[in-house]
Design a protein with these regions (language model features):
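Compositionally biased, intrinsically disordered low-complexity regions
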Residues: 5, 37, 55, 60, ...
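Residue-level signal for secondary-structure boundary elements
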Residues: 82, 86, 103-107, 244-245, ...
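Compact, glycine/acidic-enriched structural inserts
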Residues: 43-98
């Protein structure tokens, strides 16, 4: 999908900072960011999320897995657009064509049946690989991906492979629910990036210990200033000595946001 593709009900202007684990694809009207979620220095599988950073509703610091494949994300967005616009218009059709989606009429039919985007669970692209957001927070046992579920919170070893943005209880009555995150933070056995008051100091200790995965998870947790985070990812790239990661770090460091902004 090329950069010039017009995303219905989406925009390309990045209005607020985001953690380097996220590679943005588009921004929604609510200023959430849809994109690739890729963990470095970890065996976690890349996936696709909607990231709630600084939104029109305030700062949320929450990531939701919206698709385990790029096509799932596109199908989900098509469903939402068709529902909001009450059918397939020229812009939606052009977007589907540009993304190689040939069954937009089927998505239209599914949307007419009512329900939310989770009604796509019967579509061939989703069968056997549902994203975590298709499951209720209290019923995730059938999920087969590796985005953190609620069960992860009870495993210190599993939490070592997670960043803070991934641990939450979703929304309750349209408000963010941080019950799970708060419980993890109160557990003295949890990784330090869930508990620290200074991510930058913790990052330095983890990097000095050559714990690249821990340093990365720390860097992708809330309460960083961009100035500190820019220095941190530069130091991490130097230690990792990986060409692809260095390219990501350089791009992220040069994003057009002020040093005193937070993410």
């Amino acid at each position: 999908m090329r950069g010039q593709v017009r995303v219905p009900d989406g925009e390309r202007s990045l209005l607020s900072p985001f953690p380097p684990v996220l590679v943005p694809i588009w921004v929604t009207g609510a200023r959430t960011i849809v994109g690739l979620w890729k963990h470095w220095f970890s065996d976690r599988q890349p996936t696709f999320v909607e990231f709630y950073g600084t939104t029109v509703y305030g700062r949320r610091n929450m990531a939701f897995e919206r698709g385990r494949t790029l096509k799932q994300v596109i199908y989900g967005h098509l469903f939402e657009c068709i529902t909001n616009r009450d059918g397939v218009d020229d812009e939606i059709q052009a977007f589907a064509n540009a993304c190689g989606i040939s069954d937009v009429d089927e998505i239209d039919r599914i949307s007419i049946d009512g329900g939310d985007v989770t009604t796509l669970r019967s579509h061939a692209e989703f069968v056997g690989k549902l994203p975590l957001s298709f499951f209720d927070c209290d019923n995730q046992t059938d999920y087969t991906g590796d985005f953190p579920t609620n069960a992860v919170a009870s495993s210190t070893a599993a939490l070592q492979r997670c960043c803070v943005h991934e641990i939450h209880s979703g929304f309750q009555n349209l408000e963010p629910d941080y019950t799970l995150r708060e419980a993890v933070a109160q557990n003295s056995n949890s990784p330090e990036w869930f508990r620290t008051t200074s991510q930058s100091e913790l990052f330095e200790r983890l990097l000095n210990a050559n714990d690249l995965e821990g340093a990365w998870m720390c860097l992708n947790s809330p309460a960083w200033t961009l100035a500190n985070a820019r220095q941190a990812i530069t130091d991490l790239a130097a230690r990792a000595n990986d060409t692809a990661f260095s390219a990501l770090a350089t791009t992220w460091v040069n994003l057009p946001f002020a040093d005193d902004e937070m993410f």
